[in-house]
Each structure stands twice: as structure tokens, then as C-alpha cells.
Amino acid sequence: MTAPIWLTAADTALIGDRLCALGWLAPDEALTDVASAGDGNLNLVLRVFAIGRSAILKQARPWVEKYPTIAAPVERSAVEASFYQLVRAAPALRTFMPQLLGVDPAWHLLLMEDLGEQADAAALYHRASTDAAARTQLIAFLAGLHALDLPLAALPDNRAMLELNHAHIFTLPFAGADSDLAATAARLGQRYLLGAGPLLHGDFFPGAWVYGDDGVKVIDPEFCLFGPPEFDLGVMAAHLIVSGDPPEAPDHLGAAYQSAGGGAVDSALIRRFAGIELWRRLFGVAPLPVVLDHRRKDALIALAAGLIRA
């Protein structure tokens, strides 16, 4: 097994050689171009082109792509690959995600189906929430995902990634919060760290939703974990609020989830996780991709605190 080389978009020849060595390119086939495939937060994400086809190449490097000073375990690539394989095995879910075409454990590479040049759903932040059809599809995806009956061994060990996420969601953003709020966040963080419950996407926000010709797709399950379904729902609800939904979005989302066949959920816990997501996007290292004036930011801070204490 060769040691990994940490790639960049400029490494066309090296990437071509690696894809040929893996059998992902035919011997008489060559790459014609390599380009960035968007602003990846966690991983290097490239679009690779050969004659008549393209694919997405992801590499987990030993740091967070957007924040290179933050170390991150490269084993997350194997965990993400397992998530895609589990979803692919579920007929009701496989159409929601791009197909995993190849896995290179030595260089921590994933080769993915290219969904095309569609943008993610970040435009939602600049208009009034999701359209009804997309929202229905996203809720159906979560209900189906959480219904999978899987043993914990279905995913490779993800403890290091879980602890990194925990720090940046439940601990570091609350360094300047009042003690009661920080203590509540810490208790919720312990629920997250337990690793008990159904399989979760782990970062179910507009950056992971891609609109295509055949409906909305879900990508980037890099933070997947076993945990409370209310966590996925709370993250989704927080971003729906930012994109125009009322503060009652967590309750509405929980009801819609159960109507879609999802299991029973705790509405208060959805509210608390929604508050956590809002707070960490306001005070953590991964801010919302919107410009907030002081009035709007103060309103979201107050709402987040109220939801966490709900």
C-alpha cells in the first residue's frame, strides 16, 4: 500500500496516473482536465474530466479544507464511503444520493458520480425557504435513513471525527455564553457523543442539498454518525429558519417527519438541537453563508438561546 500524496487541482498528471493505477481510467484513456468542484469545507473536492465523461474526486487530507490549521482524521473518508454503500443498498434511498464509483483507502480517495454543475441549495438563504416538493423529498430521505436497521459496526470507527465535531458544535462556540446556556449545550453534546440511535447524515443543511433535473439530491455525509434523529431534524430546522421559516419550524418539521413515516421524535429536543446549530453558526468557525445586519443577528442569537432552553 503506497503512502498517500496530498493532491491539489494542479496535479493533473499525478491524478491521471493514480486513476489509471486504480482501474478508474482505461489504459488508453487520459484525463483532459481537473478543476475545483466547489468550496469544500472538509475535503478536497475536484471534478475530473476524460473524453465524454466526468466524475467527482474527493480526498480526505489530514486537515479541514476550509480551515487548514484544524487537524482532522483522514479515516473520515472510509466512514463516508460506508454511508454511501449503506444508502445504495436501500432501494427507497439510493436515488437520493450520487453513486459511489470507487474507493481508494491508501490515498483516502472517493470517486463519485458527477451530478453536473448544479449549485447547492445555498440560494435558499436569500429567498423564502425551500419549495414544497424539495422539502417533501428531504424529509422523506431523513425518514428513510433513520429507519434503516443497522448495527453500530456498519460504520468504521468514527470516534475521532465525532469528538472533533462535538468540540466545534457544542463546546467552542459556547465559550462566551452564560453558564446555564453552556451547561445545557454540554448536556446535549453528551447525547451526541453517545453514538446511540439510527444512522444520521450529521450535517443536513443546504450545503448538502443539490437540485437536479430529477429532484433534490443529498451529498457530503462526512459527519455521519449514529445518534438521535432529532439532531438531523434540528440542523435542518435551523437553516430553514434562516431561509425564511418561522421560529416554530422545529415543531412543523417534526410533525412532517412523522407524517412521512419517520418514527416518534421529541419536539423539544429538535428545538434544542436547532438552537445549537444556530448558535454554532453564529459563533463557531463555520458561519452562515449570509450577511446579517446587527438586528437580524441579534434576533437569531436570542432565538437560538430560547430554543436551546426550550
Where are these regions (language model features)?
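Active-site catalytic-loop/activation-segment of kinase and kinase-like phosphoryl-transfer enzymes
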Residues: M1-D11, A147-R191, F283
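Juxta-kinase regulatory segment immediately upstream of eukaryotic protein kinase catalytic domains
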Residues: M1-D33
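Structural element of the ATP-grasp superfamily
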Residues: L19, F83-V87, M112, Y257, ...
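Short secondary-structure junctions
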Residues: L22-A30, P91-F96, G261-A264
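Active-site acidic catalytic loop and adjacent metal/ATP-binding pocket
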Residues: A35-L57, L188-F231
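ATP-binding pocket architecture of kinase catalytic cores
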Residues: L46-L152
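Active-site Asp-x-Gly
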Residues: Y67-A72, R76, L199, G212-H252
